């Protein structure tokens, strides 16, 4: 267990002699703390997005309702998987994941959706914008994890970025119509 500059304890594979040093492939305590801060925001972002996607899933209207209703379900299932994986990664690193709507809203860069009647085009454009935001944020975390030698977090984030990239591309193609 490593002690970070913020006084929190974080687990890593580093030996106590390597704490604060940059052992090859082993993130130091400061890097782990920085990664955990970003992962906490990702959990919050995904928590807010999960609820937002449900709002769209329930309240969209338009000619292609059934297809978009099912697409939004695919998205929130995917978000759930990422949400859980990142929260569990935080726990593996010895940190705590935010676990309340109040925490999510305080940490998230994604705004709540309170509108109840949403056109399909509007909902998909908003989802695309949120996915683009997530892609930018996850890319920053992926770089930090890779540079720090945190291969596990790097791999998790790379998988999420692959999924987001495809969704952004497909939403862009859909919205061109």
UniProtKB/Swiss-Prot annotation:
Q: What does this protein do?
A: May play an important structural role in the outer membrane.
What's the name of the protein?
Antigen TpF1
Q: Which gene encodes it?
A: tpf1
An MF annotation (GO) of this entry: ferric iron binding
Its family remark reads:
Belongs to the Dps family.
On assembly, the entry states:
Homodecamer; either linked or stabilized by disulfide bonds.
Keyword tags = Disulfide bond
Instruction: Please give the PANTHER family that the UniProt record associates with this protein.
Output: GENERAL STRESS PROTEIN 20U
């Amino acid at each position: 267990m490593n002690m970070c500059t913020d006084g929190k304890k974080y687990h890593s594979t580093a030996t106590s002699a390597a704490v604060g040093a940059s052992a090859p492939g082993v993130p130091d305590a400061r890097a782990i703390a920085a990664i955990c801060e970003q992962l906490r925001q990702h959990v919050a972002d995904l928590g807010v997005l999960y609820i937002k996607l449900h709002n769209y899933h329930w309240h969209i209207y338009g000619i292609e309702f059934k297809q978009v209703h099912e697409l939004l379900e695919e998205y929130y299932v995917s978000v759930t998987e990422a949400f859980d994986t990142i929260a569990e990664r935080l726990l593996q690193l010895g940190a705590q994941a935010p676990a309340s709507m109040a925490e999510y809203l305080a940490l998230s860069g994604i705004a709540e959706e309170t509108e109840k009647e949403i056109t399909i085009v509007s909902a998909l454009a908003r989802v695309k914008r949120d996915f683009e935001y997530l892609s930018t944020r996850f890319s920053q975390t992926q770089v930090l994890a890779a540079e720090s030698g945190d291969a596990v977090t790097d791999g998790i984030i790379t998988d999420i970025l692959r999924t987001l990239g495809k969704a952004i591309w497909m939403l862009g193609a859909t919205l061109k119509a």
